[in-house]
Amino acid sequence: MSGHSKWATTKHKKAVIDAKRGKMFAKLIKNVEVAARTGGGDPAGNPTLYDAIQKAKKNSVPNDNIDRAVKRGSGLESGGADYQTVMYEGYGPNGVALLIECLTDNRNRAATEVRTALTRNGGSFADAGSVSYLFSRKGVVIVAKAGTTEDDVMLAVLDAGAEEVNDLGEAFEVLSEPGDLVAVRTALQDAGIEYESAESSLVPSVSVPVDEEGARKILKLIDVLEDCDDVQNVFANFDASDELLAKLG
């Protein structure tokens, strides 16, 4: 399992996420609000907002909360904060490279939270540019198998700009350039294939293999980072087998 694959890490952390559902809801709602502020409140004309709404719905965020977030982001309702996207770079145990994406209205608070989480869990802050070059921005669509074959997926996305389809065990991962993400997920929808998530993500070009102890440490660090209110996503370039992750899960 490559560190960028949200599918396996999401399965591993399901019990943790269930215990922190309120915090997860808040982050998903923040994502919707920022997408609406950046590209407008109409999902039909704002693919980023569409995907943020779909992700929130798939995680059972109430429709009323989603609607209010869109209105706040669009300026139709007061109360929205001035969130900014900030990317921090760091290293975890075993030299695993980390990119920590935050949405925050207080950069100093976010930096302090991230630095504390790193230093208390075997990691360290890194200078800007020392880690980011190891990752590339890609469109990532996750398709649960559920009777769908790799050939089905490849046939659907072949002409939509997909670069590769990877078998993750219980799901397929479709990679594309970020600009082709909408075309890829639309092609899947047109083919009647359900997808779990569609989003712009950071994919590592080089991965660091980790053993059981290393995987345990890096997963703990990711859990702590993602528990920070301002942290939206954590991208890591570790590589561990599905069997190992299943054992740790």
Curated annotation (Swiss-Prot):
Cellular localisation: Cytoplasm
Main location: cytoplasm
Pfam families cross-referenced by the UniProt entry: TACO1_YebC_N, Transcrip_reg
GO molecular function: DNA binding
InterPro entries: Integrase-like_N (IPR017856), TACO1_YebC-like_2nd/3rd_dom (IPR048300), TACO1_YebC_N (IPR049083), Transcrip_reg_TACO1-like (IPR002876), Transcrip_reg_TACO1-like_dom3 (IPR026564), YebC-like (IPR029072)
Protein biosynthesis among keywords: no
Entry-linked Gene3D superfamilies: 1.10.10.200, 3.30.70.980
Keyword Nucleotide-binding among record annotations: no
GO BP term, pick one: regulation of DNA-templated transcription
GO cellular component: cytosol
Family in the record: Belongs to the TACO1 family.
Protein name: Probable transcriptional regulatory protein Strop_1792
Organism for this UniProt entry: Salinispora tropica (strain ATCC BAA-916 / DSM 44818 / JCM 13857 / NBRC 105044 / CNB-440)
